[in-house]
Amino acid sequence: MTLGISWVRVAGGVRELIVASDSRLSGGQFWDANPKIVLLPRSDAVISFAGHTGDAYPLMLQAYNSILMYPPAQNRAMDLEHLKGHLNRVFDHSRKFISNLPRGQVVPDEPEAKFALSGYSWKSKKFHVWTLHFDRSIGRFTFKPASTWAAQDEDAYKLICYIGDADPVAEAKERLVSLLRARGKLRSGSLDMEPFEVLRDIIREGKFGSVGGPIQLVKIYEHANAVPVGVYWPDRASGSISVLGRPLMEYETTRWGVIDPDQPDRARPPDAVDPVDTP
């Protein structure tokens, strides 16, 4: 399963949308090197998932390919706010081709997956996050927007969205509130990297078997570009850099900087390593 968090970070007067997740797939075994965030082929948005991989991965690939098949979606003439409707239609359309159901079953099983579409809208000049989920009452996918926190001071701006198993999500929410209260930011200010710290600690503590592996992280900027950021995992001392959930091999590198999970204030160039001859 998953614990995924999307939030608007405000630092130095600049806003960026951060999407982060654990990297574990489970089901009789733990596989801790899997992408749960997919950069869509239009630079300003990503889609992430929580739930059953057999439902999620095909639909995320359908979303990716559908953008390639429709030029306005790829060149961003279709704004992010309309892209979510396109993806809803793609998901529903794809499920029409499920057949050979068990004897006596009339409709396919409900998909056990939830998605988060996160990105920057050139129309509204804002970051947005929507959860896409299957609504059994209408028999199709629908979406719900993430909203800003209420009861905040005038200078505060907190937009955050969680996807994942109920227990880890509830734990993450409680920890974030406690952390913000301890730092005097519960009603004032904006989110920085506090959600990252919460995700980091939950993974490290190993309290939830469905949540584990390296943190994967993507940043989306107001210039409408999304980039995957590396994370030293389990810590900087290990020297191991993970990108989109997978630890890099010796001869691989990343162009977009690396975060120290214990000092996540900024992404820095990776520590120098000796080049490795590749076959």
Task: Show the residue positions of the predicted features.
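N-terminal nucleophile
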Residues: M1-P279
